[in-house]
Amino acid sequence: MLKSVNLKRAFRLTLMTYKLDFKKSALKEWKKLGSTLQQQFKKKLIERLEDPHVPASKLSGADNMYKIKLRQSGYRLVYKVEDDVVIVTVLAVGKRERSDVYRKAMKRSDV
């Protein structure tokens, strides 16, 4: 199930090329993050909504799935790009430890 996010309100921007959606479980993970981590991810998401296809961030073995890394904190955000409907869907947010965040994202992308 997808949860739509109002970007104008969330990021106070008026020009976006892609719409941002969260899987319900990813939104739950997002809300558990501290405000500092959320702000860091928001800044990167704003850039990615302009151009979500970043070759260096593409997940190997997954079509149209990319990651955003916060190196210092060890957190990752995994999203899927749907070009046909111009949507970026956040699939998972979490620590990189044992690659759990990537496994969650792969499962959620199939649902």
Where are the regions a protein language model picked out?
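A short, surface-exposed loop/turn module that caps and links secondary-structure elements
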Residues: 46-70
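Enriched for short, Lys/Arg-rich terminal
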Residues: 2-19, 28-32, 39, 70-75, ...
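N-terminal first-folded block
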Residues: 22-55
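Residues that form or immediately flank small-molecule/cofactor binding pockets and catalytic motifs
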Residues: 25, 61-64, 95
